């Protein structure tokens, strides 16, 4: 009897919406500016003490962009300090934090 190996299901990017919800404070305003500059397809909603960023398909937070807006070095892990909630699958490196849903084809 021979067993055939099956390849894992291919993953494709989804167009389902993702979001980030961050505390509204002086530091996150610069982070939000960087996010909206890098994600022109995103929409921003301001609430008391919170800012929610929605985007169809994906949302990316780039370290270099945030550093430019903050005017200092910034570690992607610092995003978690002000993170309230999110939706989507997370891909995180030293250079970016990416949200997107992955559907199996």
Stretches found by the model and what they are:
Residues 2-7, 36-40, 84:
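Short amphipathic beta-strand starts and helix->beta connectors
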Residues 47-50, 55-105:
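Helix-rich interaction surfaces within compact, conserved domain-sized segments
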Residues 33-41, 68, 72:
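Short, intrinsically disordered, mixed-charge
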Residues 2-32, 49-69:
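Conserved N-terminal glycine/acidic-rich loop preference
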């Amino acid at each position: 009897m021979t067993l055939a190996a099956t390849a894992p299901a291919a993953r494709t990017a989804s167009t389902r919406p993702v979001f980030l919800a961050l505390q509204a404070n002086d530091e996150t305003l610069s982070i939000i500016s960087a996010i909206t500059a890098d994600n022109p397809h995103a929409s921003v909603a301001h609430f008391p003490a919170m800012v929610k960023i929605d985007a169809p398909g994906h949302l990316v937070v780039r370290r270099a962009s945030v550093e430019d807006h903050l005017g200092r070095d910034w570690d992607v892990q610092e995003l978690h300090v002000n993170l309230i909630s999110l939706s989507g699958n997370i891909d995180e490196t030293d250079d970016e934090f990416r949200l997107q849903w992955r559907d199996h084809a």
